[in-house]
A protein has these predicted regions:
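Active-site beta->alpha loop and helix N-cap motifs at the rims of alpha/beta catalytic domains
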Residues: 2, 7-146
């Protein structure tokens, strides 16, 4: 049995309280490409407009990240991929990744993180350094979470 059961459950006859509905309004979820592959349709389990963060773990190819972003966006959700500074080799790599996200999935938001690795794989070790490249402004990103 998986950690999370993504199968749609039959609805109960008991309605959620207004307080609970208010609390849950605007929530977000996080997926990884390999978990997203096991979800037949996000539309069956998520309300329209949910923000979906896509976790970028070390070793996950950018192509898998972009494919997941494209799929989630096509299903009608706001996509916010993780950009872990310490696994991005250099500014050219960052620009390439941003171009792929924008060109293939129309992404204009991102979560900037230092990342889970201790030793940087390249020029960046913090999310601030990603911001300092100026690429997010140049490329028209509308929302960044740091």
């Amino acid at each position: 049995m998986g950690l999370l059961n993504f199968k749609k459950k039959p609805s109960t006859t008991e309605a959620a309280s207004p307080e609970l509905e208010s609390f849950l309004k605007g929530y977000s979820i996080e997926v990884m490409p390999r978990t997203a592959e096991r979800v037949p349709s996000f539309q069956e389990i998520l309300p329209k407009g949910t923000r979906v963060y896509i976790a970028h773990l070390e070793g996950t190819p950018i192509e898998d990240m972009v494919n997941t972003a494209r799929r989630v966006a096509r299903e009608g959700y706001t996509v916010m991929p993780h950009l872990p500074a310490r696994i991005i080799k250099d500014q050219a790599t960052l620009k390439d990744w941003l171009n792929q996200y924008q060109g293939e999935a129309n992404v204009d938001q991102a979560l900037l993180l230092a990342g889970g690795v201790v030793t940087p794989h390249g020029d960046f070790e913090s999310s601030l350094q990603l911001l300092e490249t100026g690429l997010f402004d140049q490329m028209g990103f509308k929302r960044l979470h740091v």
